[in-house]
A protein has these predicted regions:
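Cross-family detector of peptidyl-prolyl cis-trans isomerase
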Residues: 1-144
């Protein structure tokens, strides 16, 4: 396969992913907005705590699903983690999404594959080149 073929295949896959995201939003909730980084978000609760920034240690509880409606993780099963924002402990898309929240906030984020788990998936539930949907249920800043 030539470099040109690979580039064309990636372009086609990216267009298909955009179409699938647009269809999901049209069917489920048209209040999502697109971020400058090209993921989609809906802030459900602003939160009253501190604005989050890179370097903050946070504890998050989330549901992680796919566009087909399947749920991969819940707080009871791998959907609860402590991370440092800016280190990409989970993935770049979620890392950037968390910067949109305040402590105590809640939001839903549709993260395209290239900002989520990419070509390799997460080696568990999320397959290769899959768009993921994070529903952040709670986020709290951890003060060392």
């Amino acid at each position: 396969m030539t470099k040109e073929n690979l580039l064309e295949m990636n372009r086609v896959l990216a267009e298909l992913e955009k179409k699938n995201i647009a269809e999901y939003i049209a069917k489920t909730d048209t209040s999502f907005r697109q971020s400058p980084l090209a993921f989609w978000y809906k802030i459900e609760r602003e939160g009253k705590g501190a604005t989050l920034k890179r370097g903050d240690n946070v504890h998050i509880r989330f549901n992680l699903g796919l566009l087909d409606g399947s749920i991969c993780y819940t707080p009871e099963h791998k959907g609860e983690q402590t991370i440092t924002i800016g280190r990409y402990d989970i993935n770049r898309g979620l890392d950037e999404a968390l910067l949109m929240l305040r402590e105590g906030g809640r939001g839903k984020f549709i993260i395209p594959a290239d900002l989520a788990f990419g070509i390799v998936g997460d080696q568990d539930c999320v397959g290769s080149k899959r768009t993921v949907i994070y529903e952040i249920i709670s986020i709290e800043k951890i003060i060392p």
